[in-house]
UniProtKB/Swiss-Prot annotation:
It comes from the Archaea. Keywords: 4Fe-4S, Electron transport, Iron, Iron-sulfur, Metal-binding, Repeat, Transport. It holds the Pfam family Fer4_21. InterPro entries: 4Fe4S_Fe-S-bd, 4Fe4S_Fe_S_CS, PorD_KorD, Pyruvate_synthase_PorD. Binds 2 [4Fe-4S] clusters. Its cofactor is [4Fe-4S] cluster. This is Pyruvate synthase subunit PorD. It comes from Methanocaldococcus jannaschii (strain ATCC 43067 / DSM 2661 / JAL-1 / JCM 10045 / NBRC 100440). Residues 25-54, 55-84 form the 4Fe-4S ferredoxin-type domain. [4Fe-4S] cluster 2 binds at C44, C64, C67, C70. The keyword Membrane does not apply.
Length: 86
């Protein structure tokens, strides 16, 4: 169990400045491969990954900076990257 105070659990530290336009790479989460370990949710520095009502994780691309920490922390490679198109 992770202490809630140890993570950003929702977008908000950049709420007035949507940081999604900074990306070079976009992380793509494959919920078929996901084992629900919550690493992506825990390690996202922007709180841009949220769990939906079905228990699947979704990336809020308005706030995702494309740092790919989520991809690096995923133990089952359920997150891949694609180059962002301008």
């Amino acid at each position: 169990m992770v202490t809630i105070a140890a993570i950003i659990y929702e977008p908000g530290n950049s709420i007035k400045n949507k940081t999604g336009t900074w990306r070079t790479f976009r992380p793509i989460l494959d919920n078929e491969k996901c084992v629900k370990c919550e690493n992506c949710y825990i390690f996202c520095p922007e709180g841009a990954i949220q769990e939906d009502e079905n228990g699947n994780f979704k990336i809020d691309y308005d706030y995702c900076k494309g740092c790919l920490i989520c991809m690096n922390e995923c133990p089952v490679n359920a997150i891949t990257k694609v180059r962002e198109e301008k």
